Amino acid sequence: MKPFRLYWSNLERYEECPQKFLWYRGWGLLDLGGGQGRRKPLDTSSRRSEHHALMGILIAEAVENIYNKEWWRQPKDLLARLNDFLDKEFSYRLQKTYIKWEESPSKSELLATCKSSTLGYLKIMKHNRLLGDLYSRSEVTLKVELDGVRMGGRPDIVINRSDTGLLIIDGKNSLSPGKYTNKDQLRWYALLYYIAHKKMSSLAFAYFRYPPENPPKSHLNKKKPSEWTGLIPVSVSEKDLLALLDRAKQAYTKILAEDFEATPSSSSCRFCDYQRDCSAFRDLQIEKADLSQSGKGFIDLSFS
């Protein structure tokens, strides 16, 4: 087994429920039904449609080409080049992606969203001058080690400008800005960058579907809406980074000790693919039902 490295997705999942982390990832010599070290197998009925993941991967690859292959240097042909790339890559990846079409938009709608969201990022990029004279890269690999804790991450976009400094961006294709996002994801990248380079970062989420000329309703409904740029800044301080590092150390130590006890809750179980296999989840349901029947609480099965 390769030495374990803690990524944000690992930390978030472990803090939600250690058993959830284990079943999604696998560990060491443990056999969860799919072989030693492999994740717990899922039957088709429990498996979630991957159409959202498909769009996210394609948009991320398009943005990666803009920066890492420097397609931005040929602006006249850029959009046509991106659309051609998305046409080909969509056909290729679609064959390898599990999609429940009764839950997903059509193929043409999925591809159209990939193209419009990529165009949305181009507009956000232009409006916010997201090219750095010092550094502009996408899908940047960060690997660090501190006090015996191995950590890693891959920020979507890293921009370093001599006038505005370092900016780390996480791209989102969400219909609802701010929903199902965790600001600590960006702070995690800031922590890694600080450990590696001793430099603080500015942080922001970029919402591909909402370029500057198309602000979301949630922004327009504010009492005094500011200018919409397509970016939502995330605050970060050295105190935030120290707190996150402490969480990482605690989780890392427990994972290496193979502490994988289930900690079910409405929030951690809501989007878990393993509800049917989890006795802790069933016990939680029974407990809620008992509370409801006794008049001491209420049952909320909206996540089941």
Give each language-model segment a name.
Residues 4, 8-9, 45-53, 104, ...:
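Short, charged/polar micro-motifs that form catalytic or ligand-binding hotspots
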Residues 8-71, 83, 87, 139, ...:
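Nuclease catalytic cores
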Residues 27, 171-175, 207-209:
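A short beta-strand motif that forms part of the nucleic acid-binding face
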Residues 30-48, 92-101, 119, 213-231:
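Charged, glycine/proline-rich intrinsically disordered loops and linkers
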Residues 51, 55, 110, 114, ...:
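Hydrophobic (often cysteine-bearing) scaffold residues that line and stabilize catalytic clefts
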Residues 58-140:
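A non-catalytic, helix-rich entry segment at domain boundaries
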Residues 136-191, 196, 250:
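Non-catalytic protein-protein interaction segments used by genome-maintenance enzymes to assemble
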Residues 147, 194-304:
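Metal-dependent nuclease catalytic regions and adjoining charged, substrate-binding loops involved
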